[in-house]
């Protein structure tokens, strides 16, 4: 699919790891939820017996307790399941201890109907007082003071207790239950105080009332107790407002006054609460914006920045576990709805790293639209530090990059306020305070305690300083301890020993505890230690630790007080860097200013689900701080008492949102860098500085004047520049009623000019002053009241200042009224284009040790998909580098490397990117891809990987333009090229990587052996000469060798010189095993060598051992092994309880031999010999047993010449199992594990049960617990003996054990999964593109599983399958919420099925013909046209090359169509060119068209020959012209060459003398020179004759016009007359008209007048209408409603058209009769066809007795005769005859059924069968043929003309088909008889027909 946007899509800006400052839970217990649960529990207990309740409690206690603990700890940010068992037991939890005694409300002391408040309180106090003894006992166990007490609803109190001690509490007398409580955290007011928020609350009473903030995030828990308003009466969004919106939007709902609206845009449902267990990001964000907790106890509430603001829960992250990301469509919908519903501010703490500012990005466009509607957007900057910080994601640069930005999309949005993160000043954590009771106090300081059990282990203990032999603080070696350490707290120094060794030695020395002092010399605490939990230990910073050592040294016998508790302590990170080290750097990649401002985001406390709280860090926490502050600003703007209210009310759209941002940035406080001499922190990191909410509100209330850059932005964007003097303008706006003057601060720190620098020791980025740089105003800054002033400033840099550096800083202005304005500025001195877009091979980012190979070529094996680094070589020191001359792949399918691609480390964002393959001459072979933009490479902390650009692969094929086929490219040198423009630049950069396409393997010759003496040992070498003419021999020098079948697969070769003909001499040492296998004779050698393209040569040779002249017997593999087992090479088992052992070798003559079998008997070996190679093969059968065998090899068949003797042992007895049991013999289990037990034979070495190696006891018995999963489990047990023989047994065990009934409980078919399913019209079998319906099928795991999709319950079938349909339409992203549950459990989980589809292919319209070839003589062909699609993304490829693509990150739900204008050049080849044009949409639907172009180079054709018809004087002359060659066309011009047209076949008729030009042209556009032919022999007409002809034609034209206007003639002839009149007028108007042309026009016009036909007269109209009515009646309904296939109309409709035409009278009678005849012909054909189709062959082929012909022949004759008739009335009579014949044939069919005959002779008159009367001959129609015994078929009765026929009685009636049904003329019904004469019916027919014929005849006579 194309739509793979933004790398990892949009991720939560997230919370960064807290590391050492991870916060532990704190705060008191809340009991309300637990009380209600206890009450419900009591009610439940009353419904069951005590025994049942006890058993139920026993069964569920463990599970529910663990779950409750996990839930409680999860809200605190602790994953209970990740704690070890000791930690799980030692951790403290909050509980409510409930007493056995009843509470006041239940003990009978109070009457609930009238007890007073005082009485209730009095009795409650008594209950609480009675708790004293139990509390004392509880405190003995917990060592904690009891917390809050309860006595009215519940009798109990709260306390803290370790998990392990909970059962102890339950055993205390008087305790009824111990219930785990929910825990709440204290909020941290420090963040609000940092930004002066409290001052706004107190001074201005602004808390966000009347404002709405949209939280576009992971969701909000609207039931949280802090999600409240103090007064919900005066709110911006009422329930009614929301319901109006939801009625229109068709989604979302009202929740409460604090959260008036919410919707889950990701899952398409109303579940707005984030169900993530570990942390709820959106809930934390919501709390920072607007939590409104109550009370003074910070442990029980959180107060956000705008506590009275309403919050919108716009959930854009799914609750599905399948995805942690969201996409453009979801996000855009939430942004748009935020604006529509009226949000004042929207917050997005999310993003995708290193974004851009293009409005093609749908999210950025949506933010812009929201701004334009007046909704301010606040977005986090991101948590990725710099792109140069490698894997750290902090403010460091290890690569020396000029472009380090990482601000993410949509935070790059121009109109958004983008927020960086600063550290909070304080944090709550576990801390230690050490005192001596008099003056010493160390701490509180952050520590890491080895276990919470040891909080009291250090208090009031003596301390012991451990010293080494030098008298310095020891690092904890055991030898440094003395007996004096016993019972004391030992103090040691960090270093050398592991932490657990330090603990172990201190404990061994008898110390009571251990303190480890850091060794870095700073105040940084030691908190990341791997400590055991069994010995009391913590660490101290160097500073604090040294103070403790000094004090203890001076007071060795004194005890110290040590308090360890959760404490608010200074944030150590804040002391190191006020900014959060993770906050992403700006600017945007086009040098636009970002981030905009900083807010507290490091270590922030806020809300979590279920009334919980936690600490998080990230720009995600800083962004909502600004969102809340802008809500306060908006409230100030809405305050009618504000003196500037009228001004603020004028602000609309972007003017409003820009103003809010400007005010905050103008009043922000720049942060200084405490680590680098208090210089400024770069504006690229902090924006305008730390937000000061009070200063911003002060400005709105007192002086809202602003300063912005010339472009209106509240920061100066200098972009890139090269002059040392840079001028820019600022716009000052004075919104007051008095004149203001401003002075620029001259502070040498804040207002100095800075550039970026890198600390060489740490890589940390910081700013440094530019000496000699300054900014000065061009004039005094005076701004009139209510006006603006634009002032020019000049930035001056010293001439010595190097280019390619940032220049930045802050401008601070003090107003004459005391107000202040702050404005950051930033630019790049140098050329922004110059920074490289791609790191080179082995470049600055190349770090193999760190897993980062930077830019590197990838070679892929298509069969396996395995990728290899191309050209990678390793030097002698083990360093890896890429040799760009060794990069190659092969087009040979047998090679290892089948294609090449590039993995690019992009140093910058790039636009207009193209990836090409070039040949050795630099010609483009193909374009692999084209992209509008690419994002730079960075390390993604979420996925723990670098995000590279993986460019497409090239497999060595190309598109052959000559025939349109894909072909393999020639071997040779090529280039893999990427090119693009750095964002913000305008110059294209190119980066090339050379490689070779090589399909030929290297050649190897002269394989031999050599030997050298090295260190007194003979070293053998295999030598050869090798050559590769293209890619070169393998640069890694890898080679595989075999000597006598002893292999060395990891050998390497060295170069030993070069031969005269270019071969490389190579040698590779033999391994010791190979050397031992050498013999004196023909040694078989094999050399396997590859080139760099992986083409392999496998060369075999027979080699002699150096110095050897004899040819002894050589057995391959070093001889017959000492042992033959199932793993021995050469052994092959058979099915008869044994096998065959085969070996081979060489000898100059045939070899024979013997072997001994298991019984010791000698047998002959089976041997073969190849004299050509001197090689032999021998085999011997072996038995599955253990025995000794001998093998003797002889040089003769008589076995007298022994060559070699071998002794070996056959070891083929496999190990055996006895008493092997799986699951104690049962095939079923309900447990999580089963036992596999058994005993194995004594020779067994190992037993593997599945993946587990079983332990064998002395009796060779084993027992293994094997875990099993739900369903079928195949358990394999394999025993292996010392010889490698194995025996395997297996069994399938079916388990019903399922610890999580809902895990994997639903699976879908056909590739459908939870999460995103992306497909097009052809890629998904479950989808029907014609209907847009998806049919989803699948299966559930349990019969008790329930499945709900999109709010509808899905039926589950007995076989556990299901099927349901979803209407997906043809385009869009369609999410459907899924809820999976189980009827046996009271829990469900939420998932989502999301379908992203486009089922409509794009349309492609090309201006060049795709049906017929195009011919041209221009080699530069332009393909032009347009492509459109139903979505906005299109990519274009031509001839297989990707030549254009649009911005890929689209909003597929936008409804906006896609459009691409195509204008692409193609270089043509001479001859035929097949150009393939393809357009592809976002879901890979492709439309392809071909243009065939023939190209021949331009040439000049020979001129044509022109011949006149006469050269004598004549009125006309015809000029003919012939081209000089075939295939050419001659054209002529009569206007001097201005226009040309083809010469007609008959020639050019010339009527006036003149010059005519002729030229030849061909299909390619070639032309000949034009030749002139001058006509001079045209004789002119006599002027008098010409004038007479003109006058005659003029008169005739006038007459014709009069006739046309009379209205007396039919339309056809009138139209023809009009055309003739126009033609005559044209002839008359010709300036060179001749007498002949005028006479001809006169003649044609007179003909048209003569052909005028009068319209239908009234009397004929009446007759015609009657005739048509008669025909309609004759047809009846059945026949009339049949369709004429030639017109597609029914016959009745055709007759109705005729009736309408007759009534209009626009045609003549003859025209009507002709049309009617056509209709009747069609009727006859249709009727005949119907009769024949209804007649079985046995009847149709039977003879009609009356005619002697078959019935089929009768039908055909009647049809032919009728259609041959020219008269409509005759045709009607034949129609009647066919209808009569239909009745007769039907009777014959019935008779055939009854009698079994089909000859038409079985009917009787009384049964209606008739006598089979033949069809009348054409001349007999209408004559009386006697009684036919049957009625005509439906529609057969023709109503008579009342004027001519009176044969029917007035009593007659007819049915709806015109059939007489009663009266004298009625026919008998089926089965009736009649006594009427047969001629009565025929008489009627005859009279009717005669009347019609007479009428027609009369009309003709008239």
Curated annotation (Swiss-Prot):
Residues 1797-1812 have a biased composition (Gly residues). A motif (LPXTG sorting signal) lies at residues 1867-1871. Its EC number is 3.4.21.96. The modification Pentaglycyl murein peptidoglycan amidated threonine is found at residue 1870. The active site is at residues 217, 281, 620. It holds the Pfam family Glucodextran_B. The keyword Zinc-finger does not apply. Residues 1796-1874 are annotated as: Disordered. It is a peptidoglycan-anchor. It catalyses: Endopeptidase activity with very broad specificity, although some subsite preference have been noted, e.g. large hydrophobic residues in the P1 and P4 positions, and Pro in the P2 position. Best known for its action on caseins, although it has been shown to hydrolyze hemoglobin and oxidized insulin B-chain. Residues 1830-1843 have a biased composition (Polar residues). Residues 1-33 form the signal peptide. InterPro entries: C5a/SBT2-like_Fn3 (IPR010435), C5a_Peptidase (IPR034216), Ig-like_fold (IPR013783), LPXTG_anchor (IPR019931), PA_dom_sf (IPR046450), PA_domain (IPR003137), Peptidase_S8/S53_dom (IPR000209), Peptidase_S8/S53_dom_sf (IPR036852). The keyword 4Fe-4S does not apply. Residues 34-187, 1871-1902 form a propeptide. Keywords: Cell wall, Hydrolase, Peptidoglycan-anchor, Plasmid, Protease, Repeat, Secreted, Serine protease, Signal, Zymogen. One of its GO terms (molecular function) is serine-type endopeptidase activity. Its main location: secreted. Disulfide bonds: none annotated. One of its GO terms (biological process) is proteolysis. Belongs to the peptidase S8 family. Protease which breaks down milk proteins during the growth of the bacteria on milk. This is PI-type proteinase. It comes from Lactococcus lactis subsp. cremoris (Streptococcus cremoris).
